Amino acid sequence: MTRDRTPLLGGEWVIEDIAGAGVIDRTHAFLRFMPDGRLVGSATCNNLRGRHESVARTLRLTLTATSRKQCAPALMHQEGRLLKLLPRVTHYRIDDTGALRLRTAAGEVATARR
């Protein structure tokens, strides 16, 4: 099985939309795909860590840890939606506008841009 991480590497992917809902202004949820398979980022309020593995356009994200800060309820809700969606991602694509689309088997999509 050949690993194909190259399109995902290269800086922060800032989350713009989580399953059809935009993110709260001036929040900074992001993902960074590392060459060694690590996944790091911010879920909105808390940092996250995990692993990523991709083959062709399939993608598996495994979350291993998050920090445990408490933030305003709206921020925690946004963060919860993202943390719930990420482990269910099965595919990705980078569209013509450069947006990263993370898709679950149920058709939910998170959108991010560099």
Place the predicted regions along the sequence by residue.
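Lipid interaction determinants
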Residues: 1-114
